[in-house]
């Protein structure tokens, strides 16, 4: 199994499909695809991959409840590449993601797996040139990874022809449906061939997701990770009661005086707070980057590049970053604000320990937040402990 994948106890997986495939060789994949899988670093399928790749290849609709770090991107990427007809130079697979960053990351994975195949993969995302999209869509791209707004626009303009689409994949469906994309996604469904296979992946199963499954999926295979396993293994969860909002900043600087951390991601709930915190930390000589949804795509790319290269030690973000960006060297995540949407908690703290490293998540809570934190514990069947005074030992 690749280092990037969290192992899951088999007893924590429920599936309505009884075949489990323990080896990529046993999936009877195209030779070129198999070479790409091993070249990418996958050794054996993760628990989700053992159960979901085959039914997707067989053309069944699949509903998989899986969070970041379980190998879900590999699951649908491998299945999509297996089913693509390389001779047909037209879009055959459509993958939707809630953010541009996640769409680009998925595109990178698909391209890496397809390195020995004759397959073109295009990212159809906001903030990029319409001309580029138009040329790629008319130039034989077979797998399109995109965000709902831009994909809908391209189909609506009749630039993206959907006649050959046979597979529609929705990644992070709970996030897409909760952030205003619902109407566009429903419209995209109506513009695809009625025979299209639907694969839906979601960390949680709120009503919006279940509504999509009942409206657009045909007798889907369901693969569900039990809710109490949705917190990623290896993440130590702690809280600090700062009592009042005004004491958060002092708590943060005290924390940095006590520990030695290579890099950290700090989450705030608003752009304004991201900007204020960034400014205060810079005044105190911290090397800080900030990222939020209003930034131009080019600016976001530059900021992420700086952070990944290590030239910035702290990345402050709104929930934009909480889904799908691999920041492998991060050992600490700080929720400066508890997330306003409890489904986002898992995505925020999942940043820390996804790649086999021990991760620490520290939540700053005011007296008013205690109830919300207890609700998070109930929702995820987990425990958030008070940060011990011997905090430096956590980072040894």
From Swiss-Prot:
* Chain residues that bind ATP: 66-73
Question: What PROSITE patterns does the record point to?
Answer: DEAD_ATP_HELICASE, HELICASE_ATP_BIND_1, HELICASE_CTER, Q_MOTIF
Q: Which Gene3D superfamilies match?
A: P-loop containing nucleotide triphosphate hydrolases
Q: State the span of motif (Q motif).
A: 22-50
- Keywords tagged on the record: ATP-binding, Cytoplasm, Helicase, Hydrolase, Initiation factor, Nucleotide-binding, Protein biosynthesis, RNA-binding
Q: Which residues form the Helicase ATP-binding domain?
A: 53-223
Query: What name appears for this protein in its UniProt entry?
Result: ATP-dependent RNA helicase eIF4A
